[in-house]
Structures are given as structure tokens and as C-alpha cells.
A protein has these predicted regions:
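Enzymes that bind and transform nitrogen-containing heteroaromatic metabolites
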Residues: 1-185
């Protein structure tokens, strides 16, 4: 069975967004070692899951980057745009973008159906409420939390209840980001 791997930027005090979803706290000064790690993580996946609320910005950003061949993110952007994306939504039937389809079915059944299909692992990016739902329903097999060197005091969280985790790896980078990889217990 394929694994569902959560990837999220997070603050040292556990927030994935400011009170209104602000992301101005994120560290974008990524060194080559961190970019290489992100590329390695991406190679193990062939499908992206997204919550509807973050999809528009995600698609718009990566589809713009692939028009900029000199961008340091160009190679990664090609992977993001080329990979099939499944967007979970209760309200929208169609979303514009390359390799995008919308899933309106019940979350647990739809995710388990995707996980049972042949292929590489599945990577999931936010938003906060979508990630929280996946965690609460015990659908996540691995968490890659990119801990940014900042505390914001309040904001959006992905953990709404006690969630025991086992640390698999923890690696620090020159940008101050520490990537903690966990498995749910």
C-alpha cells in the first residue's frame, strides 16, 4: 500500500499559518543541501493531495515558476506541475490547472482508495484544516515537518488533539530550518 506523507512548514511553536493564514514567517533561504533533500522526498511520490483552500495559490505559483527556466526552483516546479494532483473539496467540482482533478467523495474512503492503487507514495500539502482532518482520521503515514526558526504566538494548527508520534529523523540546515520526520504511533 502506498504511504501518505504530509509535508508542512511549521513554526517552532507549532503553527502552520498566522491567525488569518499568513505565511510571512516562512524561511525561504534554502541551501543546496535542503533543496536536495526536498527533491529526494519528491522522487518517492507520484501524486499530490491538496486541500481546496491552498490549491489556487499552489497551482498558480508552480505554474508560474515553470515559465522561468532560470529560477532555482525550475526543476522542482516541473515535478510539481507534472505530477497528478487530487484536490479535496466539498464545494467545487472543477479547478483549473495542469494535471488537477477534484475529489468530492468522503475523505477517508477517497484517501484509502488512492493509497490502495499501485504507484509511488502520495505527498500531501495543506491547508491547515485539510491536514488536521487527515491527521484526525489517522490517514497520514509519515510527517515531514519543516520547523522554521520563528515563533508567532498564535495562528493555525494542524494538531487538534493529542497525537503520539515516533521521531524517525531530525536534520538541521544552515537556514535554521530543522526537518523532523515522524511516524504516527
Amino acid at each position: 500500500m502506498r504511504k501518505l506523507k504530509l509535508r508542512s512548514q511549521i513554526t517552532v511553536d507549532g503553527f502552520v499559518g498566522g491567525p488569518q493564514g499568513q505565511l510571512d514567517w516562512m524561511t525561504f533561504d534554502m541551501d543546496e543541501k535542503l533543496l536536495s533533500f526536498i527533491n529526494e522526498l519528491t522522487e518517492t511520490s507520484d501524486t499530490i493531495l491538496l486541500g481546496r483552500k491552498m490549491t489556487e495559490g499552489f497551482i498558480k505559483y508552480w505554474e508560474h515558476v515553470i515559465t522561468q527556466p532560470k529560477s532555482p526552483e525550475y526543476e522542482f516546479a516541473q515535478k510539481m506541475v507534472g505530477m497528478p494532483k487530487v484536490v479535496f473539496s466539498k464545494t467545487v467540482k472543477k479547478i483549473e490547472g495542469q494535471n488537477v482533478r477534484v475529489e468530492n467523495g468522503p475523505l477517508v474512503e477517497a484517501v484509502n482508495r488512492l493509497k490502495s492503487q499501485p504507484g509511488k507514495d502520495i505527498v500531501v500539502y495543506g491547508g491547515a484544516s485539510f491536514l488536521s482532518s487527515l491527521i484526525e482520521n489517522r490517514l497520514i503515514d509519515e510527517l515531514n515537518l519543516f520547523v522554521n526558526p520563528v515563533a508567532i504566538g498564535k495562528g493555525m494548527q494542524i494538531f487538534s488533539q493529542r497525537t503520539p508520534l515516533t521521531l524517525i529523523a531530525s536534520v538541521g540546515y544552515t537556514s535554521g530550518i530543522v526537518v523532523n520526520t515522524y511516524k504516527p504511533k
